[in-house]
From Swiss-Prot:
Belongs to the PdxS/SNZ family. This is Probable pyridoxal 5'-phosphate synthase subunit PDX1.1. It comes from the Eukaryota. The gene is PDX11. It catalyses: aldehydo-D-ribose 5-phosphate + D-glyceraldehyde 3-phosphate + L-glutamine = pyridoxal 5'-phosphate + L-glutamate + phosphate + 3 H2O + H(+). Vitamin B6 is an essential quencher of singlet oxygen in plants, that can protect cellular membranes from lipid peroxidation. D-ribose 5-phosphate binds at D49, G178, G239, G260, S261. Keywords: Lyase, Pyridoxal phosphate, Schiff base. The active site is at K106. It comes from Oryza sativa subsp. japonica. D-glyceraldehyde 3-phosphate binds at R190. Catalyzes the formation of pyridoxal 5'-phosphate from ribose 5-phosphate (RBP), glyceraldehyde 3-phosphate (G3P) and ammonia. The ammonia is provided by PDX2. Can also use ribulose 5-phosphate and dihydroxyacetone phosphate as substrates, resulting from enzyme-catalyzed isomerization of RBP and G3P, respectively. Also plays an indirect role in resistance to singlet oxygen-generating photosensitizers.
Length: 318
């Protein structure tokens, strides 16, 4: 993990190289730096999906750094099918009133009006999410048009840098939400980290052709090479169901973890939530991980992703 020596990730756009992201508008560049800084405040934390104010309070008491307000967790979206849209603003307001930690909410990819509504009701972060049904299969939201920070998913370095160019202040792996199966999240993290390791060994001439090959902006590719990491915080998401899963993602180099269906589809949600928070905090200590993993009851029932009938949410956009 590249830091400034104090354990803090370098904020993209805060230096002369970073200013290239949003040229020629210095105002936009400053605004983006603020949004990246807000996302960076969640580093080292766990963000939990909740569907009621009571679940939100359980998440806060367990030590979550933020909650994601939803009408249905991803496991229910998979099971029930149909069109998945932005949650009812009234529900989001109720969840906001119930907790003191930041509240996120999801908008459909490309649906900038849903994002406008979420910003208007005061959510702290918007997740432009492939878990919801696509609204636009050709365009993502121009996130620079908003004051609220955005979270976006990725499967590889090129996808991550394209979302950052659009204004994403936080990147998460897509994984396969609602499955309780961490294999795709691991694949996506390893892909991003492997691409960055390869990039660091390239000379500057090679970076031009590499940026074209992965369809990513050259300036962002070069900055990623210099930092040795993404220019924004990177969280793991999609299939994280146990404390061991969460610690695995942290050891692979993530800055934090999203946990969706894995908590409130388990046998003892409050205890599992506390255990996952502890696992993220102490991810490199196997003794603590063994202790917090004990006596949690049944984990959520997972889905075998080798089954070709399983819908792949992660493939919904690039």
């Amino acid at each position: 993990m590249a830091t400034d020596g104090t354990g803090v990730v370098t904020v993209y756009g805060s230096g002369t190289n970073g200013a290239a992201l949003l040229e020629p508008s210095n105002h936009k560049s400053a605004t983006f730096s603020v949004k990246v800084g807000l996302a960076q405040m969640l580093r080292g934390g766990v963000i939990m999906d909740v569907v009621t104010p009571e679940q939100a309070r359980i998440a806060e008491e367990a030590g979550a750094c933020a909650v994601m307000a939803l009408e249905r967790v991803p496991a229910d979206i998979r099971a029930q099918g149909g069109v998945a849209r932005m949650s009812d603003p009234g529900l989001i307001r109720d969840i906001k009133r119930a907790v003191t930690i930041p509240v996120m909410a999801k908008a459909r990819i490309g649906h900038f009006v849903e994002a406008q509504i979420l910003e208007a009701i005061g959510v702290d972060y918007v997740d432009e999410s492939e878990v919801l049904t696509l609204a636009d299969d050709a365009h993502h939201i121009n996130k620079h048009n908003f004051r609220v920070p955005f979270v976006c998913g990725c499967r590889d370095l090129g996808e991550a840098l394209r979302r950052i160019r659009e204004g994403a202040a936080m990147i998460r792996t897509k994984g396969e939400a609602g499955t309780g199966n961490v294999v795709e999240a691991v694949r996506h993290v390893r892909s991003v980290m492997g691409d960055i390791r390869a990039l660091r060994n390239m000379d500057d001439d090679e970076v031009f052709s590499y940026a074209k090959r992965i369809a990513a902006p050259y300036d962002l590719v070069m900055q990623t090479k210099q930092l040795g990491r993404l220019p924004v915080v990177q969280f793991a998401a999609g299939g994280v169901a146990t404390p061991a899963d969460a610690a695995l993602m942290m050891q692979l180099g993530c800055d934090g973890v999203f946990v969706g269906s894995g908590i409130f589809k388990s046998g003892d949600p409050a205890r599992r939530a506390r255990a996952i928070v502890q696992a993220v905090t102490h991810y490199s200590d196997p003794k603590i991980l063994a202790e917090v993993s004990s006596g949690l009851g049944e984990a959520m029932v997972g889905i075998n992703l080798s089954d070709p009938k399983v819908e792949r949410f992660a493939a919904r956009s690039e």
